[in-house]
């Protein structure tokens, strides 16, 4: 092999290696920023079609209804813990260390985004509450399916305390 062919081979090898490195870094970056949506039942039992459960440490979004009577606040900090359930009966505990949205109440639909820290526990970095009584996030509405009924709030729930 002459010198010219060796240079071409080295250049082609470096080019292919560089493209492979860039592609792998790009896929890694996209994968780490991917937030998959799960219902509480899917977190506990796995997806219906595939049986795939989210892994501990994975960034996910979970949507459902805040279980009435499940909210526990730490009086000395912003830390709050509450349960989110769906129509199929699955329940996930969500912990959050920031201010909750003004529209957050027990018995209403929410979407929480964060990291799964245990099989049924999510450490949320963001909590989104529905806008009004008629609105429900599309993922939650689809996950709740036909069994979602309009909720009747008592005076205490409407006041937010």
Curated annotation (Swiss-Prot):
Segments passing through the bilayer: 9-29
Binding site for heme: 131, 135
Coiled-coil residues: none
GO cellular component: plasma membrane
Record's subcellular location: Cell inner membrane
Topology of the protein relative to the lipid bilayer: Single-pass type II membrane protein
An MF annotation (GO) of this entry: heme binding
Primary location class: membrane
Function (record text): Heme chaperone required for the biogenesis of c-type cytochromes. Transiently binds heme delivered by CcmC and transfers the heme to apo-cytochromes in a process facilitated by CcmF and CcmH.
GO process annotations (BP): cytochrome complex assembly
Pfam families referenced in this protein's UniProt entry, alphabetically: CcmE
Stated name of the protein: Cytochrome c-type biogenesis protein CcmE
Stretches in topological domain Periplasmic: 30-161
Protein family (similarity comment): Belongs to the CcmE/CycJ family.
Organism whose genome encodes this protein: Shewanella woodyi (strain ATCC 51908 / MS32)
Segments on the Cytoplasmic face: 1-8
Superkingdom assignment: Bacteria
Keywords: Cell inner membrane, Cell membrane, Cytochrome c-type biogenesis, Heme, Iron, Membrane, Metal-binding, Signal-anchor, Transmembrane, Transmembrane helix
Gene that produces this protein: ccmE
HAMAP family attached to this UniProt entry: CcmE
InterPro entries documented for this protein: CcmE (IPR004329), CcmE-like_sf (IPR036127), NA-bd_OB-fold (IPR012340)
